[in-house]
Curated annotation (Swiss-Prot):
It comes from Cereibacter sphaeroides (strain ATCC 17023 / DSM 158 / JCM 6121 / CCUG 31486 / LMG 2827 / NBRC 12203 / NCIMB 8253 / ATH 2.4.1.) (Rhodobacter sphaeroides). One of its GO terms (molecular function) is tRNA binding. It comes from the Bacteria. PANTHER family: 50S/60S RIBOSOMAL PROTEIN L16, LARGE RIBOSOMAL SUBUNIT PROTEIN UL16M. HAMAP family: Ribosomal_uL16. The keyword Ribosomal protein applies. The keyword Ribonucleoprotein applies. Keywords: Ribonucleoprotein, Ribosomal protein, RNA-binding, rRNA-binding, tRNA-binding. This is Large ribosomal subunit protein uL16. GO terms for biological process: translation.
Amino acid sequence: MLQPKRTKFRKQHKGRIHGEAKGGFLLNFGGFGLKATEPERVTARQIEAARRAITRHMKRQGRVWIRVFPDVPVTSKPTEVRMGKGKGSVDYWAAKVKPGRIMFEIDGVSETIAREALRLGAMKLPVMTRIVVREDW
């Protein structure tokens, strides 16, 4: 699964996800993409599950690009532990996804296969998404 090799700090504040995506809202690599339409934290496991669903439907044809990276550490305390005594340990890594962000791109397959693959991948994600197609400009 995806996670940073090293970070400046081990733990982060939760924070909020405000506004629209400032970058990564255009198709840069493939002809079809999966665009988020709402803000959410997407875990590394969810990204991996979506990637597997997409590549499995494409049957190793074409190419997949993952455009989000889980760089936010999410902490949790063990079960049945009293409050206090410091922040919990890092449980998993997540990516903060803003509305408009392209999460996955694919290319090298027909439009019907691409749409179905992205639909299956979108089912694994906690965000509302829409499929975008590169217009030939």
